[in-house]
Amino acid sequence: MKKKVTIVTIILFLLVIVGSFGKVTDFIINLEWFKEIGYTSVYFTKLAAILKLMIPIFIIIYTGLWFYYKSIRKIIIKWNKVVEVNVKTEKLKKRVAIVIDVIASFFVAYFTSSVYWYRILQFTSGNSFNIKDPIFNLDVSFYVFRLPLIESLYGVMLLFLIFMAVLTVILYIVLSLRDRVYNRNIGGINISFKEFFKGLSDFAGRQFAIISGLIMFLVAVGYAIRSFNLVYSPRGVVYGGGYTDIHVSLVFYVIIIAAAIVSSVVIFTSIIKYKIKPIFVSIVAILILIIGQSITAEIVQNLIVKSNEKNLEAPYIKNNIEYTRKAFNIDKLSESNFPSSDSLTQADIDSNRDTVNNIKVNSVTPALEFYNQVQVVRYYYDFRDLDVDRYNIGGKYSEVFLAPREIDSKSLEGNADTWQNRHLIYTHGYGLVMSKVNSVTSEGQPNFVIKDIPPQNSTNLKITNPRIYYGEETDDYAIANNTLGEFDYPDGSKNKTNNYDGKGGIKANILNRLIFAINKRDSNFLLSENITSNSKILINRNIMDRLNKIAPFLSYDKDPYVVLSGGKLFWIVDAYTTSDRFPYSQPYNNVNYIRNSVKVVIDAVDGTTNFYIVDKNDPIANSYSKIFPGLFKDVSQVPKDIRSHFKYPEDLFSTQCNVLGKYHVTDTGVFYNSEDLWETAKNQKQINGEKGVNDASYFIMRLPGENKSEMVLMEYFNMKDKDNMSAIFGARMDGNNYGKLILYKLPTDKTVYSPYLFKQKLNQDPSISKEVSLWNTQGSSVQFGDTSIIPIKNSLLYVEPVYLRAQGKNSMPEVKRVIVSFGNKMVMANSIDEALNQIFNNSSNNQSETRTETGGTSTDSSNNKDKLKQAQDLYNQAVDAQKNGDWSKYGDYINKLGKTLDELNK
C-alpha cells in the first residue's frame, strides 16, 4: 500500500514538473531577453513589486484565516460537546486546514499583487503635480497615484470580510441543520429571527462581532472614498462635482461616515451582549441616510438647481474648463485672430517661397498605393504605411513621404511556407522609398529620390545598412546568422544573402536551443543543422509588441514612423502617459489626462530600444523614472539627427482637437449656452462623394510673424454643424518650438471656406467643373487629394491636387492638375507655380474673370463652328488616348481642349 502511494506521489510530482515546463521556460526566455536588451532591472522591478505586495497580503490573509479557523474549531468542539478529542484526527484536520489556508492565502495574495503591483509603486513614488483640486485642496497626485490603491485595498478587504461573515453564518446554519436531524433541542432555521440571532451569537459571537464591526467601519471608509470621487461626478452640466454634489451629497457623506463609525462600535458591543435592537437601529439609520441622500440630491437638482443652473453651476463650470484644459495641455496655446484678408500679393508669395515650395501636390493614400504597385519588388515585401517627415536634401529643408520595405512572412504560401523560409531565410526587410511631397513625374506619379533594391539614391542622405530585422510586420521569431544565409534582396536571377552581425538576439547555444524547443514545442531548434553556436535567436521583433513587453504602463501611438539617420533605419514611437483620475477633467476615450512625455527610438537592425523623457514637467513620467531606474534616459542623450525628426504625434493632436472643439471657450456663460461649439472640418475626396472628416496634415511653412520655415501639424475647425471655417489649429515641432500650440481664430462676420466648402466652390466654377466632368467620364474617375489651406501673411491660400484614375484592377491615380484659389480667384493649372502666376500676374486671363466675361464677346458664327469642331476632335482624340492608356497624349489633348473652350467663352 505504502509503495503504491509512493508511486502515485512520484507520478503526480512528475506531472506537475512537466506541466510547469511552459511557465519555467517562459520565465527563462523572458529573463534572457530582458538581459539581452539591457532592461533586466525593469523585469525584476515588477517581480519585486509583486512580492513586496504579495508577502504582507499573504501573511495578513493567512493569519486571519488561521486564527478564524482555530477559534471556530474550538467553538465547533464545544458545540458538539466533545469530551475527548481524537489526536490523530485533529492532526489530520489541522494539516488539511493549513493546506487550504496556504492555498487560499496564496491565490488571494497573488491575484491582488499581480493586478495591483503597479499601484503600490505609484503610491510610494508618485510626484506632486503642484495643482490643487478645487474642493478638498489636495494635490492632484493624491487622486492619480494614491486613491486608486486605497480603493483597491478597500475592495479586497471588504470582500474578505463579507466572505468571513457569510462563512460564519453558513457554518452555523449547517451545524443547526445537522442538530435538527438528530433532534437536538437547539435553535435551528425555522425559528424566529431573535432566536436565530441568539443562536448565532452563542455559536460565534465574538468572531461575528469583530467581522461585522469591521464591515461597518469599511462602510465609513467607502463613503470617504466616495466623497473624494465627487470630483469625477457626472451629475451636473459638466464633469466633476457640481452644486448638488458639493452642497448636498458631500454633507450627507460626512454624516454617513460619522454614523457608520459609531455604528461599527454599536454593532460590535451589541453582538457581544446579545442585543438586537441597537444593531437594527444602527443599520436602519445608515440606510435612511443613504436613501435620504439620494432623494434630497434629486430634489435639489431638479427643483432648485435646474431653474438657476447657469448661476449656481458657474463656479463648477469654471473648474471643469480650467482642469480639462490643463489635463489635455491646451491651457497654454497661443491664440490670435487671423483676418483672412484678400490682400495677398506676388511679393508676399515671393517672400514666402519656402512655404510655397513645400506645398503638397502628392497625397498620402494614392502615394502609398503607387509605392506598393511599383516598389515592392517581390510579393513578400510590403509597404504597410506612408510616413511624413522632413530632411535637408541638397541644402533645402524638404517635406517628404517615406516608407520602409518590410518583409511579410505571412505572405509565404504553398511550398514556400516552410520553417526554414519563415525563420532562417526571410528574416528581414530591406531599404526604404522616399519621394518629395511637392513634385510629381510627368505622368503625375510620386517623384522618387530614393527607390529600388539596392537603393538608388539621388539625395545627399547616406544609406549603409538599410536592413529591417525589427518592424511593424516582423511578428515571428528569426534565427539569424545561420549557415543557409539570410535572403537580402534579389539580384537578377540570383539572390544576395546576408549574415546578421547585429548585437541583438539571444545566443543559440545548446541549452537555449533546448529551452526554445520546449517553449515553442518545435524540435527544429535542436534538429536543424543550419543553426550554430554563433547564431542569434531574435524574438519580440514586432516593435509594438516589444514596447508593450518592456513598458506596458505606457500607451503608444498607433503610427510608428521610420527615420533614416547615419545610414541606418530607426523607428520612432510616441509614448503617452495617461490617466482617468484627473479631477474635474472631461474624459475623452476613457482618458482625462494625457502627455506625450516619452519618445522611443528602436534600431531596426539590432532592436536596441531607448526610452527618452522629453517632458520633464510630467509627474507621471517622473514617477515612472523613479519606479524603473535605468529605463528612461534624458532627452539630452538623443542623437542630434534623430531628435531633429521628432514629430508632434497625430493621435495626441486628434485628441486635443476633440477637446478644443468645446474647450476653446473659457467664458462660463458662453460655455453653458453652447454658443461657440466647433468640430473638425469635413472634406470630400470624390465628385459627389460622401462628406468625411478632414485629416490633419503636416506642412513645412513659415508661420505668420516668424522668420524661419518649420514643420507644423495643422487641422481646420468649422462651426458646429456648419461648413464655414472658424479656426486653424497647429502644433509646432522644430527645435525649441517643439510642442507649442497655436490657434488662429477666423473672422465670424464673413464666410471663410472650409475644405468641404472649397470643394463646392470649385465644383461650381464653370471652366473647372466642365474640365473635371469631362475627365470623370466612363473609363476614368476624378479624385481629389489632400486639401491644403495655408496661412500666408494675413491671407489663406487653398491648394487641391486633382487625380485621374483609369478603370481597371491595376490602374493607379495620377496627379493631372492642381487647383489653387485665393480670394475670389480660382485656377486649375499643371503646377502650383503656373497657377500662382495666373492668379497674381495674369489676372485678366484667370478663370474667375473669364467666367464674368462669358457671353460678353461678339464672334463670327463660322469661326465658332470651326472652334466647336476642333473641340469635338480634341475630345475624341483624348478619349482614344485614354482607352489606349497613353496618358501623356491624353493630357496634351485635354490641355488643347481647355484652351479651345476658353477661346469659345471669350
Curated annotation (Swiss-Prot):
Species this chain originates from: Clostridium acetobutylicum (strain ATCC 824 / DSM 792 / JCM 1419 / IAM 19013 / LMG 5710 / NBRC 13948 / NRRL B-527 / VKM B-1787 / 2291 / W)
NCBIfam families, alphabetized: PRK00068.1
Residue ranges of the region described as Disordered = 842-875
GO CC field:
extracellular region; plasma membrane
- Biased composition regions of type Low complexity, renumbered to the chain: 842-862
The UniProt keyword set, sorted, is:
Cell membrane, Membrane, Transmembrane, Transmembrane helix
Its ancestry begins with: Bacteria, Bacillati, Bacillota, Clostridia, Eubacteriales
Q: What is its main location?
A: membrane
Q: Tell me the membrane topology, using the record's own terms.
A: Multi-pass membrane protein
Q: Which family does it belong to?
A: Belongs to the UPF0182 family.
This protein is called what? UPF0182 protein CA_C0010
InterPro entries attached to this UniProt entry: UPF0182 (IPR005372)
Q: Which residue ranges traverse the bilayer?
A: 7-29, 47-69, 96-118, 153-175, 208-230, 250-272, 279-301
Question: Could you confirm whether the keyword Transmembrane helix appears in this record?
Answer: yes
Q: Which HAMAP family match?
A: UPF0182
Cellular localization per UniProt: Cell membrane
